[in-house]
Amino acid sequence: MLEQLRTYMEKQNLDGFFVQNHENVRYISGYTSDDAYLLITRGRQFLITDPRYTEHAQAECPDYTILNWRGAAPNVGEYAAQLAEQEGLKAVGFEKDLLTVKFHEALCTAPHTEWIGTEGVIEEFRSVKTPEEIEKLKVACDIASRAFERIIKDIRVGVTEKELASRLSHYMVMEGSDTKPYGNILISGARTCLLYTSRCV
């Protein structure tokens, strides 16, 4: 994944790339917790987090330099700006569709670094699955199938859709999901077209 990103950086004449989308952070680095950002340069990779996650980050990302921003800067954006200056980065790409104006202003406090907005770069990498990713998808499908087989037995009159969705999330974890799945929605009957509901089945 890093090789793909660095090839892109070279083609676009970028000295660095700043990653703030948590799914993309995980894809590039393998880091599974929240509150993490990456600054990738041509020769180094930095994972920016806060002290709560340092030990976890070191364990999961041994090839990364783990940096804590708290106490070193008012916010992550200004810390990333300082780091870009320190590393002598002249042009750094970032995920423009995820950045607030305030965050962008913080990045732009680096006087000698140009921040260049990009869109869908890492998502494009993610769209083509490696053999290892395909195997992981098969495992995920098996987990979902087993959880679905369990939830079928719980569907009966008087149980709410909200309760069933909660049980399904629980079964997913019990069957081997790394984390509680986000956004499970279980709806039946006449209200199926609604995204959120809690009526009884």
Predicted segment positions?
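Terminal domain-start leader segments
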Residues: 1-46, 77-81, 85-88, 109-115, ...
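Conserved beta-strand termini and adjacent loop/short-helix elements that scaffold enzyme active sites
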Residues: 19-20, 67-71, 116-120, 182
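Structural motif
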Residues: 20-22, 49-51, 70, 94-98
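Short helix/loop capping segments that flank catalytic or ligand/cofactor-binding pockets
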Residues: 27-28, 56-57, 102, 194-195
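Compact, glycine/acidic-enriched structural inserts
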Residues: 51-68
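Short, basic/aromatic beta-hairpin or loop at an interaction surface
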Residues: 179-190
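Conserved small/polar residues in nucleotide/adenosyl-binding loops
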Residues: 196-201
